[in-house]
Regions:
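ABC ATPase NBD Q-loop/coupling interface
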Residues: 55-79
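Conserved beta1/A-loop at the N-terminus of ABC ATPase nucleotide-binding domains
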Residues: 2-15, 56-58
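ABC ATPase nucleotide-binding domain helical subdomain, centered on the C-loop/LSGGQ "ABC signature"
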Residues: 61, 96-132, 177-178
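Conserved catalytic motifs of ABC-family nucleotide-binding domains
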Residues: 49, 82-104, 200
Length: 215
């Protein structure tokens, strides 16, 4: 739940969807003009920045009370989230070392769904291939597909996607939409920033964010 959230940047307040309820187990898409505060809203959710006004809360279904995410231990909160940034980077090491524990069958199934299998086939050691600083040797689109693969095999209840189709052609966009449908089918809450129409049309809920100059 987002309540009266505002984040200041360069003197501009971004009252990010003043009041909105994120639907659990559904695809929630954030839309709005560039600079409106979509990414800042995500950062606030992840405790990377602190809102200047308002709060983001979780609803405790048992007690019907709301818990401000700022009250949660950051490390424990992060364990519930898988984040796929717009420009994924990889740390030096093998691909397998950057994945959560999973069987080879699960990894291969996720890679196939995310159209990462062709990349794997081109690597000499597949999952055990060393990747350089920042994912050298993989394009931005390939790193994004790897990040989606990682999200599919993770078990976090929340998945955050920052413009997951931004660097993809129409065919690859369909791949991403299928992956998101799988996440939704797993009962996971997906929050995505989107500009492209196909992802917006696939949403269970569209949350509009607008910036506003405030004195």
């Amino acid at each position: 739940m987002i309540r009266d959230l505002s984040i200041a940047a360069r003197g501009v307040w971004a009252p990010a969807c003043a009041n909105a309820l994120v639907l659990p187990g559904k695809l929630n898409v954030l839309v709005g003009p560039s600079g409106a505060g979509k990414t800042s809203t995500i950062y606030a959710l992840m405790q990377l920045i602190e809102p200047d006004r308002g709060e983001i809360c979780l609803r405790d279904q048992d007690s019907a009370t709301d818990i401000n995410v700022r009250e949660l231990a950051r490390e424990q909160w992060w364990k519930t989230i898988t984040w796929v940034p717009q420009h994924p980077t990889l740390i030096p090491g093998t691909l397998r070392e950057q994945l959560p524990p999973a069987s080879n069958d699960d990894l291969e199934a996720a890679a196939s769904l995310c159209a990462f299998s062709d990349v794997l086939d081109s690597l000499p050691l597949r999952w055990d291939t060393p990747i350089g600083q920042g994912g050298i040797g993989l394009s931005v689109g390939q790193r994004q597909r790897f990040a989606l693969t990682r999200a599919l095999v993770a078990t976090t209840p929340i998945v955050i996607l920052d413009e997951p189709t931004a660097h993809l052609d129409a065919a690859s966009e369909e791949v991403v939409l299928r992956a998101i449908e799988t996440l939704r089918g797993q009962g996971r809450t997906v929050i995505a920033i989107a500009h492209r129409q196909a992802l917006i049309e696939a949403a269970d809920q569209v949350i509009e964010i607008h910036s506003a100059q405030m004195n």
